[in-house]
Amino acid sequence: MTAPGDLLQALFLRLKSDKSLSALLGGAGLLEHAADNAAFPHVTCGQTSAFDWDTGVQNDADQLVTLHVWSKTHGEAETRAIMDSIKARLADAVLIIGPRGQTRLVLEFAEARYDEDLLVHHGLLRFRAITQDSD
């Protein structure tokens, strides 16, 4: 099993090592939580949940992680370019997180839209992270 914090740390390390994504984000655009004055574009981590769909109880071996992409000036094209870069880096990736085993990422959902209330383009990427323990 992989703790949600360990998983997020591994995801962010993998994304931060991607030079093309860093260029799209202007360097410091990967944020755990965005401050009100955060520069655009940026990516934040949204809800993370660990759940066993068969038994209905919490289970760190099967987690959902949501990443949010935020863009203002360059809009939808920028949002989609950042989303594509993240998908290329994470979809079907296998992460080794500590001694517990391998965590495989599968893209479950992606959406880009304009948020009229916030006046920003907003992209959502939801990944399922499935950990298989080493024996």
Residue ranges of predicted features:
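Residues at secondary-structure transition points
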Residues: 2, 6, 54-58, 73, ...
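Small/polar-rich, solvent-exposed N-terminal microdomains that initiate assembly or binding
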Residues: 1-55, 93, 97-100
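Acidic-leaning, charged glycine-interspersed low-complexity segments
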Residues: 17, 88-135
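Oligomerization/assembly interface segments of phage tail-like spikes and tubes
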Residues: 59-73, 121-132
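Short beta-turn/strand-loop junction motif enriched in small, turn-promoting residues
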Residues: 50-53, 72, 112-114
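Mid-chain, well-packed structural core segment of small domains
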Residues: 70-92
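A broad, low-specificity signal marking well-ordered, structured residues that form hydrophobic/aromatic
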Residues: 28, 43, 65, 105, ...
